Amino acid sequence: MAVVFLLGPGMWDKARRPTADPAPMQIRRNIARGLQSRGHEVILMEDDPDRPEEDYIQKFDRLLRCKVTDVVLYWPPLAKMQTTYDELILLCDRRALLEKASIRLWALHHSTVATITREEFKVLESGNRSRYLTAVARLGLRPLEWEDEEDLAEQVRLLSTEL
């Protein structure tokens, strides 16, 4: 079974979407439960206790090196994504580790936020970060696109069989 490092936003971007339930963090927890129910271990940074004198990047590295087999990015529309962008860039800087450990990358993204191919990661939302994220696509990012909650649940189910 897989060890999944599940990345993604924790909250909505209040400037673009009024606060609504469930928050992206809750949806990530639901995704985690779905994967766990199929026998996979899931790591969420928010749930792992901070360690004394460990900064955010050190925590990210420690968790990534924790027998992770797959990194899954959850990306809904209108979410606050800055920290998630940073995490994706951190993955690019860890290319050697990803290759050595054969860690696969997945993007569970809404159809309105990005188009992803092997050679391009094009952000469709405002605040375009495409030129930086194309390097992530070139790491072998596997896109899993969804349109609505039912479609998201189906993509999670299909993902759980691929892990």
Tell where the protein language model's regions lie, with residue ranges:
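Conserved catalytic or regulatory cores that recognize and/or transform ribose-phosphate-containing ligands
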Residues: 1-163
